[in-house]
Structures are given as structure tokens and as C-alpha cells.
Curated annotation (Swiss-Prot):
Annotated GO CC locations: cytoplasm; mitochondrion
Function, as annotated: Catalyzes the reversible transfer of the terminal phosphate group between ATP and AMP. Plays an important role in cellular energy homeostasis and in adenine nucleotide metabolism.
Full protein name: Adenylate kinase
Catalysed reactions, as listed in the record: AMP + ATP = 2 ADP
rRNA-binding is among the record's keywords: no
Sequence segments annotated as region (NMP): 85-114
Oligomeric and partner information: Monomer.
Length: 288
């Protein structure tokens, strides 16, 4: 169950056994296809992604609040592969009153990043659970966050593509402060109405409010870590740590940098375009 933790702590003499254990959990597919590093929208048509060629094994990177979960979840449904979000794993552990819950609560409330050891532990358990259910492929959201995590992942599986979602800081802060959650069903909404000038001559970025149904309005809560101070602290920590991870995957030719042009209505079709995906084709496919 703690295969990734054992690998994280292991010496070189014992790492091969741990790697073998995690490799089985990850259900590694055929050798990965190289994807040229690029930044949308500068050259969206040069992507060589072919998700139908084999099992999808993708990673989504991006700042807190950028929308990793939203787009990874949509792609998960479209492609029929599990969406594994480390943020959800942490929140599930917090609700469980398990052995890590108190430690995690202190870390989250202070706006700090959860340690490699804890994340690897939670992810290992999730992967083993998925293996038992016959899952194949995955879209990882929020992992890896450090080069060490990326190195561990590389040792045990082939990552086909790493999508790095990007938004300006002002938009990220407003999005995070506008997040609301239904206290009963757990569904996410966003009450922020965003309209800001783009950076470096880019078009304006507009995002409409994602208003909840009237019956849900009185059940909305704000996440404890969605205060302006904590949001800015999270962004600062993320930027300090993310560049080495981006460079790691860029050097392998697997990084796709995607500047979100707006909200879901504007961004989703563009993301499908750079990934060479036809939503209607997948919806009509019996395997979808």
C-alpha cells in the first residue's frame, strides 16, 4: 500500500523492487510518443498528440485555481480514463479522520504545500485501489509538484503528455476568492465575474459567474484556504517550485503550455483543438 513511500525513502539497493510494485499499479502502456513543447495559441497545430494510439497517461500542471480539475475531469469523461486529483485525495483524507487528517489540516490551513511523503502515500493507495478495479490509464492532476516526484513517476511509467495550464495572477486570485462549494453535494461554483486586460498585448480575459441553482444558494460555503492571503501564499510557493518541474518535462519534449483564453466556453474547444480531439467523435464512439 505504501509502495511510493518506500520508493521515496529507499536506497539505490532496494529501489528496483519498489519500482516494480508501483509499475503494476500504474498499468504502463506502450512506449510514449514525444510531444513538442509549445505554448498555445502561438502554434496550436504542431501538436502530435494521438490519444487513440494507446492508453492515455497524462499529467496536468498549473497554479492553484487555474482549472486543472475542471479540464482534467472533462477529458477523463471524454476519454474514459480515471481523473486522479491529489487535491481531492487530500480533502478525502481530511474528511476521513484518518491518521494523517490532523497533520494535513494544519498544513492546508497555513496555505503550505503538502509534503512529498504524504502525497506519495495517498497517491499510492489510490493507484492500488484503481488497479483492483481494472482501471487503465490516468490523468494526474496536481502531481508531480517537485522534480523528485517527477523523477519517481518517470522511473515507474511512461508519461505521454504534460499539459501546463496558465492564467495571469490577477485572474487566479479572483477565481480562487470566488470559489464556492455546496455543503451537501460538494459541487463547485464560482461567483466571481472576471474581465481583465490580457498581459503583453494578449486579448482580454473574461469569465462569467457560474451561478448555482436557487435551491443551492443558501448551502454554499467557502473553502477555509480560500482567503486572499492564503491564495497569494499558495501561488508564491507554487511558482517557486513549479519552474524546475516544467523544465524537467520541457527537456523531454513532453510539455504543452496552454494559456487559457477565458472561461470554459472559450477554453474547452481550444484545448480540444491542441490535443487533436473531436468531442463529437468520442461521444459517438461505443467505447467512449
Amino acid at each position: 500500500m505504501a509502495a511510493m513511500i518506500r520508493l521515496f525513502r529507499s536506497s539505490s539497493s532496494s529501489s528496483s523492487n519498489s519500482i516494480s510494485l508501483i509499475s503494476r499499479s500504474l498499468s504502463t502502456a506502450a512506449a510514449s510518443e514525444t510531444v513538442k513543447s509549445q505554448s498555445y495559441p502561438h502554434n496550436p497545430h504542431s501538436t502530435s498528440v494521438d490519444p487513440k494510439a494507446k492508453t492515455v497517461q497524462w499529467v496536468f500542471l498549473g497554479c492553484p485555481g487555474v482549472g486543472k480539475g475542471t479540464y482534467a475531469s472533462r477529458l477523463s469523461t471524454l476519454l474514459g480514463v480515471p481523473h486522479i486529483a491529489t487535491g481531492d485525495l487530500v480533502r478525502d483524507e481530511l474528511k476521513s479522520s484518518g491518521p494523517l487528517s490532523k497533520q494535513l489540516a494544519e498544513i492546508v490551513n497555513q496555505g503550505k504545500l503538502v509534503s512529498d511523503e504524504i502525497i506519495l502515500n495517498l497517491l499510492s493507495k489510490r493507484l492500488e485501489s484503481g488497479e483492483a478495479k481494472g482501471e487503465a490509464g490516468f490523468i494526474l492532476d496536481g502531481f508531480p509538484r517537485t522534480v523528485r516526484q517527477a523523477e519517481i513517476l518517470t522511473e515507474v511509467t511512461d508519461i505521454d503528455l504534460v499539459v501546463n495550464l496558465k492564467l495571469p495572477e490577477r485572474v487566479l486570485v479572483e477565481k480562487c476568492l470566488g470559489r464556492r462549494i455546496c455543503s451537501e453535494c460538494g459541487k463547485n461554483f464560482n461567483v466571481a465575474s472576471i474581465d481583465v486586460a490580457g498581459e503583453n498585448g494578449a486579448p482580454r480575459i473574461s469569465m462569467a459567474r457560474l451561478n448555482p441553482p436557487f435551491t443551492v444558494c443558501f448551502k454554499l460555503i467557502t473553502r477555509a484556504d480560500d482567503t486572499e492571503a492564503i491564495v497569494k501564499e499558495r501561488l508564491s510557493i507554487y511558482w517557486d517550485k513549479s519552474q524546475p518541474v516544467e523544465d524537467f518535462y520541457r527537456s523531454q519534449g513532453k510539455l504543452l503550455e496552454f494559456d487559457l483564453p477565458g472561461g470554459i466556453p472559450e477554453s474547452w474547444p481550444k484545448l480540444l483543438e491542441v490535443l487533436n480531439l473531436d468531442e463529437q467523435e468520442y461521444k459517438l464512439s461505443p467505447a467512449a
